Structure formats: C-alpha cells, structure tokens
C-alpha cells in the first residue's frame, strides 16, 4: 500500500465532511457513526470506504479531485489499492 493513498483518503474525508449533506450520505452508506468514523480513521478499510464513496458518485469524485488539485483517477486508483486483496482488513461479502 502507498502511504500517499492513506493521506489522500484523509484529505478527501476532510472535503467530504465540509458539506453536511455529503457527510451524512457517507455515514449512511458506510454504516459508520461519527464516533465510529473517528475511531477507525487509521484502518485501511475505513479509508478505502471513504474513497470508494467518492468513486461511486462521479460528481463528488470530480469535485473532490478539483478541490484537492489532482486528477479524479488518482482518487479512484487509491481506492482500488486500499481495497486490494492484500488487505487483511478487507471484508468479503
């Protein structure tokens, strides 16, 4: 895993949380509570969920990438790496 992916996920999370409806949608879709999100910020699965949330909503993905001054595909690629099969925390459905 790239440490940059974790940093990128945290920056993206900051962008998400700056907008209350978007933050509520993240919590609703991930099933996390605000306390649960805070407690799990160091976990790869949580960071992957943050980036996957963006990757699943193209308008948010593009807007977040613009705000972070990066290409949207960097966010999507980071999500893919964080979700990778090498992750011991990956939840298999």
Residue ranges with predicted function:
Residues 1-93:
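Metal- and O2-centered redox machinery and metal/ROS homeostasis
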């Amino acid at each position: 895993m790239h440490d940059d992916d974790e940093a990128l996920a945290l920056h993206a999370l900051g962008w998400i949380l700056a907008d209350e409806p978007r933050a509520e949608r993240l919590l609703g879709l991930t099933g996390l509570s605000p306390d649960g999100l805070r407690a799990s910020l160091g976990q790869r699965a949580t960071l992957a969920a943050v980036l996957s949330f963006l990757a699943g909503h193209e308008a948010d993905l593009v807007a977040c990438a613009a705000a972070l001054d990066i290409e949207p595909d960097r966010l999507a690629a980071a999500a893919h790496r964080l979700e990778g099969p090498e992750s011991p925390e990956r939840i298999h459905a």
